[in-house]
């Protein structure tokens, strides 16, 4: 039987950075609320949750890198909403943001969670920010807690 390494969902004593896009703030504000709620419900103190707002989703990876460089965060949660329009801009932004977030996580060995809602319509984005499809900010924050704890488990193993 293999040894299973698992981690709990306690955020107590951990520090989290939330990076949120101001663009489409009618969506991202709901994602931020969901993320903060998830962190607090899992034991994080308000003082240990740091929120930074950036102009748009494209700017998130750079700020994630800067926050990771500081070495003060157990996990970084990236929140934004990119909604498809009539030009290829959506594809460029989504591709670069997802690559950038993954790159920061790998470079600094810190969980950097992709909480960017990428949808075809405004309605789909609204659904993913707290209505029919749950709140992806909440989901991203829970992933951040689990990954922060799992990093500790694996480091100690």
UniProtKB/Swiss-Prot annotation:
SUPFAM superfamilies: Lumazine synthase
Residues where (2S)-2-hydroxy-3-oxobutyl phosphate binds: 86-87, 128
Binding site for 5-amino-6-(D-ribitylamino)uracil: 23, 57-59, 81-83, 114
Pathway recorded for this protein: Cofactor biosynthesis; riboflavin biosynthesis; riboflavin from 2-hydroxy-3-oxobutyl phosphate and 5-amino-6-(D-ribitylamino)uracil: step 1/2
Active site per UniProt: 89
Keywords, sorted A to Z: Riboflavin biosynthesis, Transferase
Record carries keyword Transferase: yes
Pfam families linked: DMRL_synthase
GO molecular function term, any single one: 6,7-dimethyl-8-ribityllumazine synthase activity
Top-level taxonomic group: Bacteria
Entry's EC annotation: 2.5.1.78
InterPro entries referenced in this protein's UniProt entry, alphabetically: LS, LS/RS, LS/RS_sf
A single Gene Ontology CC term: cytosol
Keyword Ribonucleoprotein tagged: no
Top EC class for this record: transferase
Catalytic activity: (2S)-2-hydroxy-3-oxobutyl phosphate + 5-amino-6-(D-ribitylamino)uracil = 6,7-dimethyl-8-(1-D-ribityl)lumazine + phosphate + 2 H2O + H(+)
A Gene Ontology BP annotation from the UniProt entry: riboflavin biosynthetic process
Family (UniProt): Belongs to the DMRL synthase family.
Purpose: Catalyzes the formation of 6,7-dimethyl-8-ribityllumazine by condensation of 5-amino-6-(D-ribitylamino)uracil with 3,4-dihydroxy-2-butanone 4-phosphate. This is the penultimate step in the biosynthesis of riboflavin.
The name this protein goes by in its record: 6,7-dimethyl-8-ribityllumazine synthase
